[in-house]
Structures are given as structure tokens and as C-alpha cells.
Amino acid sequence: DYIIVQDSTLIKDVNVFFGMKEGGIAIVNTEKAIDSPVPKGVKVITIDATSIALQKIGLPITNTALMGAFAAASGEIAFTALEDAVKRRFRGDLATKNIAAAKAAFDAVKGAA
């Protein structure tokens, strides 16, 4: 099981971890530690994807940063596959910036492992 939480304020109002099984991974866009109960055996990875997006893209659009974090945490997607997908979706400078955001998040998660 995997979940990606783009807005960490949801955790206060919604049990985003409901139904997650042991061995699951939750990636949460936040600069803070999670203080909500987490099911046994679920690994929570926090990453400040908003700051990464602002720094690399210039906008608080977190999608590619969170996908980079997901690729690193899960191993389900090779970074090269993510990079290729970004290049198919975006062109020029926008592709370069989104790849940089994904790579920064990927490296941050790999470095924390």
C-alpha cells in the first residue's frame, strides 16, 4: 500500500492512513513530523515538497517532487522512467525544472533511507 498526502492539514480531519497494511508507505508533504497515529508497520516519509517545488520550479506545484519521493521510497518507478514521463508531458525549461524538483525529492528520500 502507498499513499501520497499533498496537503498535510488533511491529517487532522481525515484518517488518511485508514486501511493501510503493514509494510505500507505514506509520503506526506510537510516539513514537520507527523503526530497522528499511524497503523503498525506503516512507514511514514515526510518531505517538504512545497519548498522543493518553489525552489526548483518557482511555483508551489508539488506533483513532480512527490513523484520523485515516491520513486525513491517505493522502488516501483525507476527515476529514469519518471524523467522520461516528465519529458513527454513538458517541454523546454518547464521539463528541466520539473525534473530538477523530482530529482531533489528523490535524492532527499534516498539520502534519508
State what each model feature region is.
Residues 1-113:
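Active-site cofactor/cluster-binding pocket
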